[in-house]
Amino acid sequence: KGEANGFFTALGVPTTFLQTTFYYEAFLQGQGPRRDDNGELVLSLPMADNKLALVAGEDIGKTALGVFRRGDDFIGKTVSIAGTHATGEQLAAMFTAALGEKVVYRPMTTDQMRASGQPGAVEVANMFQFYSDASEYFTGVRNLDLVRELNPELQPLDTWLTQHKDEIPLD
């Protein structure tokens, strides 16, 4: 992505760059809480106590539309989007509220994720390592007020979880 951005810039193409982040929908595809051997719901992500920026997939297009509607305002700029910034503990609390059952956060390391053997584990661990290593920058460039201005329908994660709670695989 970064390499392609350089081509647009070098050619002088009037461009706005849109940076996305971790999709809420990943929680529907195995990244959400799982029951441990004791039946407890556990959310394990390799993010320690850092904040993660997250967004609903459908909000990406709606935010891009908001950028287009502003005409030249964002040409040559980067718009980094998110709908929520949250720590692992905050994510677990949102899952608890949505599911009506206690979810605990147990961080794992990126090395543990890489070694998990899950499909795509190495790539996902690398992504989380970047998110974690650059957490302050990564969440800092994602101005939730600006994104909400561009997309008034922007969904915070807690709202999205409530709407999709029955789709989240827990076992």
Question: What is the predicted function of each stretch?
Answer:
Residues 106-108:
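NAD(P)-dinucleotide binding in Rossmann-like oxidoreductases
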Residues 110-171:
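A hydrophobic C-terminal alpha-helical subdomain
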Residues 1-104, 113-120:
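Oxidoreductase cofactor-interface core, primarily capturing Rossmann-like NAD(P)-dependent enzymes
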